[in-house]
């Protein structure tokens, strides 16, 4: 059931910050003999690499993203434009991991600036990079493939401001940064909220929805207007204080019919539904999950697959009736720490599992009906993002 894996091991071991990994650095990449039409690309946060998996076979090719041998690049999420053979990857340069019970203890705590890297899809060679702010979170392409959006999950900023005391919560805000996808020119930036992470755009690319982990809100960004004006929608009546969330929204997912936005919450351990027409969350549509909800995907307009942690698992949720239709757990030798679900154009479903952040993580193909694993690929350490070669 497990596919073969080729490539480097944990290249992040004993690595330092990204201070020496200058913006002019590139990497050679390597030959990838998996056709793009059947390939998926997975960022490996702990092993500084991208795994390419053959969705119709067993092959896995792991390509290093080492800009500098002593830097821990920590690729975190990616977006693909197959038409221009481009891959955009956020490089986080996190601090050295300390012994902690929290497997994500280093996430959002970097002191060094991050980077947005553009790679060649054919070889995964790094062609160019641009500085972003500390702790880049999500990276997405607009549907017209003209702009790249980068959020910043900067909990360190929030904690530093809180420790000083007396400052306005707005000084904790991290930015949404927008680049031209063609030439990597920075088009603008806007402070949006405390520790923004998941972002999704409407099909017309006029609006972005940003999940704001550190301030318990969903921010709506007007991408069509100068300055990218924002409006804010709290997730509930009893938000946590800035930097200490009660709900902890991690991702925002737009339904295929674009009528609702689903926000998945870590601390709140639920999914919440925003009605786009009224710009209000619907309390009767909230679905408690009794586990941390990460980055889900829609199967249809009202059916959602949600990856869960603490306890680990996967839930299929009927949003129309606000209930869990099915729930599955996995043996630890198959999947540890489910992070993101992706649904391919052919309807096949994939689940990325972080693993223990040291040994290889995994990608599972999931049966839509039973939620049972159909196939497994071993990838690099701490995988946390996935995109398809035909996007």
Predicted regions and their residues:
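Sec-dependent bacterial lipoprotein signal peptides
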Residues: 1-8
């Amino acid at each position: 059931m497990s596919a073969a894996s080729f490539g480097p091991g944990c290249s992040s071991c004993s690595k330092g910050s990204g201070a020496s990994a200058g913006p002019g650095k590139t990497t050679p990449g390597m030959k990838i003999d998996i056709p793009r039409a059947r390939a998926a690309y997975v960022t490996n946060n702990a092993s500084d690499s991208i795994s390419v998996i053959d969705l119709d076979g067993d092959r896995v090719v792991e390509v290093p993203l080492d800009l500098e041998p002593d830097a821990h690049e920590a690729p975190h999420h990616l977006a693909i434009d197959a038409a221009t053979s481009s891959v955009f990857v956020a490089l986080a340069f996190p601090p050295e991991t300390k012994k902690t019970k929290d497997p994500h203890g280093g996430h959002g705590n970097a002191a060094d600036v991050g980077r947005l890297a553009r790679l060649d899809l054919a070889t995964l060679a790094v062609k160019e990079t641009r500085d972003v702010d500390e702790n880049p979170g999500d990276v997405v392409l607009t549907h017209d493939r003209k702009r790249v959006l980068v959020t910043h999950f900067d909990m360190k900023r929030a904690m530093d401001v809180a420790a000083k005391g007396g400052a306005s919560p707005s000084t904790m805000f991290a930015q949404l940064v927008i680049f031209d996808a063609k030439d990597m020119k920075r088009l603008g930036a806007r402070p949006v909220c405390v520790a923004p992470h998941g972002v999704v755009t409407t099909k017309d690319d006029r609006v972005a929805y940003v999940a704001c982990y550190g301030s318990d809100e969903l921010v709506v960004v007007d991408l069509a207007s100068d300055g990218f004006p924002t409006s804010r929608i709290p997730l509930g009546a009893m938000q946590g204080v800035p930097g200490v969330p009660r709900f902890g929204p991690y991702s925002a997912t737009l339904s295929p019919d674009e009528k609702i936005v689903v926000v998945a919450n870590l601390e709140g351990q639920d999914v919440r539904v925003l009605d786009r027409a009224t710009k209000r969350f619907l309390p009767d549509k909230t679905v408690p999950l009794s586990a941390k909800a990460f980055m889900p995907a829609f199967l249809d307009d009202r059916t959602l697959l949600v990856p869960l942690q603490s306890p680990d698992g996967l839930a299929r949720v009927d949003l129309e009736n606000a209930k869990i239709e099915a729930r599955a757990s996995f043996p630890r030798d198959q999947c540890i720490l489910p992070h993101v679900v992706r649904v391919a154009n052919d309807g096949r479903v994939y689940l990325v599992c972080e693993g223990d952040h040291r040994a290889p993580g995994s990608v599972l193909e999931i049966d839509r009906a039973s939620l049972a694993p159909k196939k497994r690929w071993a990838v690099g350490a701490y995988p946390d993002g996935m995109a398809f070669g035909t996007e």
